[in-house]
Amino acid sequence: MTADNKKTTALALFSGGLDSTLACRVVALQGIRVVAVKFVTPFFGYDLLQAEDEYIRKIKETSGIDVILKDVTPQYLELLKKPAHGFGKHFNPCIDCKIFLLSEAKKMMPEVGASFLVTGEVIGQRPMSQRRDALRVIERDSSCEGILVRPLCAKNLAPTQAELDGLIDR
């Protein structure tokens, strides 16, 4: 089914890298309004807060994506004290970080009118956080079951409720 989604909005987790940019574009090409959120902490993207308007304009001009910057430093620092799923390479709390960021994005959904969430995750691309079992844990522990669409690998995953409801075509 091709979705007629002029009224549908997706909230995408956006790193600014290729995968999240492609995920946003794939969804937008279906006529779905995409709002992207780039979470920042002192460990990633913090310098962007000094030139927030410039960054937002640049992403809109180069990728056609509307992006919001959101500083989650206090909550992220709390997560670092004891990540439930441990640390990955280079002291990264990969799985816990994804759970946290998706949980934060889910809280933002009403604010932007989003019906579902989007990420640029690809099965097997990252050894700790993008294994099939890890993707399920992340979705479950972030309470994003059914609303988390991973368009770059959707055909390799079970359909989400958003897909079953016809909000997005896999």
Model-derived features: positions:
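ATP-dependent adenylation/nucleotidyltransferase module used to activate substrates
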Residues: 1-170
